[in-house]
Amino acid sequence: MDRKRSRKFRWIRIFLWGLLLSAFLGQPVFSQSWEESFYEEQWGKSGAGEFIDSLPPEAVDPLTQRGLSPKDGASLSAEGANSIWQYAGDALLENMREPFQVFLQVAGVLLLCGIPLALQPGGKKLRTPEAMEFLGALCGMLLFLAPVSLLIQNICETIRQGTGILLGGIPVLCGILTASGHTVAGSTFSVVTAAAGNVVTLLTTSFLVPVLHVFLAISSISNLYPRMRLQVLCASLLKALRWTLVFAVSLYSALLSMQSALSSSADAVTLKAARLSVSSFVPVVGGAVSDAVSVVQASMGVLRSGIGSFAILALLILFLPGFFSCTLWVASGCLLEGLCGMLEMNRMKGFFHSCRDVLQTLLAFQASFCMIAVTSFALVLSSGGTGA
C-alpha cells in the first residue's frame, strides 16, 4: 500500500515539475509573440507605414539598399552611422565634378582676357581693353550663373521635401507619444513643429528664392556697370535675409526648449500619479497592472525610436548632397575671386564675391532648417525616454 502511494506521489511530482517547466519555457515565447503582434498593431494604427511610404525616394533608397529599416532598431543603431559616412563620401565625389568643370571653364575665360596684361611691354602699365574685359566678364557670369541658379532651385526643393518629412513624421511620433501617456508633450510638439514647418515653407517659396535671384541679378548688373552703384541695395537685401534667418531659428529654438521642459515635467507628474493610484487603490492586481502599463509604454517607445531614428537618417541623406554642393561652389567662387584679383579684373572680382555671399547664405539657410528638423525629432524621441 505504501509502495503504491509513493508511486502515486512520484507521478504527481513529475507532473507538477513538467507543468512548471513548460510554464517557464513557454513564457518567453508567449511574451515575444505578444510584443510582435502589439508592435505590428501599433505600426498600422499610428500611420507609420504611410509616413515611411511618403518619404522621398532619394532619402530612403540609400538606407534600404544598406539593409536599414525603421522596424529594426538594432540595425539602425549599429549601421546607421556607418551608412551615413559611406553615403557622405559618395555624395562628395558625385557633387565635386560640376563645380570643378565650371571653375576650369571660367578660369580659362579669365586667363584668355588677362593675356594682354601679361604680354604688355616692360615699363608700361596698360589696362585691359574695355571691350575684352566686358566680354570676359559677361561670359564668366553666364558660365557661373546658370549652375548657381539651378543649385538655388534644387536646394529650395530639398528644403520643401525636408519640410514634408517634418510635417509628416512629427504628428506620427506625437500620436505615439500621446498614446503612451505623454499627452502634454504630444500635443505641444505637434503644434510647434507644424507652425515651424509652415513658416519655413512660406519663407522658402515666397522669400528665399526671389530674394536670392534678385540679389544675383542686381549684383551682376552692378558689376557690369559700376556707375549704377547698386552694391548698397545688394548688401541690404542680403542683410535682411540673414537677419530673418537668425530671428526664425532663435524663436523656434526658444519655443521648443521652453515647451519641452514644461511638457516633460507635466507628463512625468501625471504618469507617476496614475501609477501610484493604480498600485495603491486597486487590490491584489494593482502592481501587475502598473507593470503592464510600463511594458506597453516601453513597446511604444521602441516603435517611436525606430521611426524617429529612420526619419533623422533620411533627413541627413536628403541634405548631405546640398551641403557638399554649396561648399564646393563657395570654394570655386573664392578661387575665381582670387584669380580675378591677380589679373586685376575688378568687375569679375566683385561678381564672384557676391556669388560667394549668396551661396553662403543658402548654405546657412539649409543648415539651419536641417538643424531645426533633426532637433525636433530628437526632442520627441527623448521625451519620456522609451517608456517613462
Feature map (PLM): residue ranges:
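Loop-centered beta-sheet repeat module
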Residues: 190-254
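Interfacial loop-to-transmembrane junctions
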Residues: 237, 343-363
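Juxtamembrane helix-boundary/capping and inter-helix hinge elements in multi-pass membrane proteins
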Residues: 165, 226-230, 341-349
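Hydrophobic alpha-helical transmembrane segments in multi-pass membrane proteins
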Residues: 102, 106, 110, 114, ...
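Mid-bilayer segments of alpha-helical transmembrane spans in multi-pass integral membrane proteins
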Residues: 138-147, 166-183, 203-211
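Gly/Ser-rich, low-complexity
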Residues: 1-17, 23-133, 147-161, 166, ...
